[in-house]
Amino acid sequence: DNTFATPALQRPLEHGADVVVHSATQYLGGHSDVVGGIVATSDEELAQRLRYLQNAVGAVPSPFDCYLVLRGLKTLDVRMERHSANAAVIAEALQAHPQVERVRYPGLESHPTHRVAARQMSGFGGMVSFECGGGEAAALEVVSHTELFTLAESLGAVESLIEHPGRMTHASAAGSPLEVPASLVRCSVGIEDAADLVADLTAALDRLP
């Protein structure tokens, strides 16, 4: 699944992957106005089987949805550069904040797989998550008091989003090995001014006791 990185930052087929999937709803479309998905392979035989299945089950997007994704692809490179640059600034700022216990961003040298990401990616993307030292209550307080970051699920669009995975996107994983920490906050960093985004998150964190 190359949704978070997109072909602009990482090309899994060049690293030996047989099949790569993308949610075109996210960065490829990039504007929160289309729903779609893409399956890519360099194996022609497999590609023919996929085309047959697509035709047989009717999983065909509308012409207008295709237009929206193609429009998004025209600006994909410049958007991903800005997403990555903004996310790097935000990750560094979060790492220095006393209310933040841990920051998860592959662009940070502290990330356990930073070396792998640096080797196979040309940028580190726009997804940043962090754990609040004050636990779930602190995380819920933060996501409820940002102004530029919109409290919403989804990701990968030009606007910045913030959410509490334990209560939102990953709620169904509660009680399973895939359960996320209750103190976790996830940010889909947009292309707004980085200083404004840092100030927004800092203000929300500074509210915490």
Question: What residue spans do the PLM features occupy?
Answer:
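Conserved PLP-enzyme active-site core in the AAT-like
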Residues: 1-99, 104
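Residues that form or flank phosphate/diphosphate-binding pockets in enzymes
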Residues: 7, 137, 196
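Structural motif
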Residues: 18-20, 25, 38, 67, ...
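Conserved small-domain helix->loop->beta segment predominantly found in fold-type I
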Residues: 88-147, 153, 170-179
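Active-site beta-loop-alpha junctions enriched in small/polar residues
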Residues: 3-5, 9, 108, 133, ...
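PLP-dependent enzyme catalytic core of the Aspartate aminotransferase-like
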Residues: 79, 144, 160-209
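A common structural junction motif
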Residues: 57-58, 146-154, 204-209
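Short, well-ordered beta-strand elements within core beta-sheets of diverse protein domains
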Residues: 69-78, 125-133, 185-190
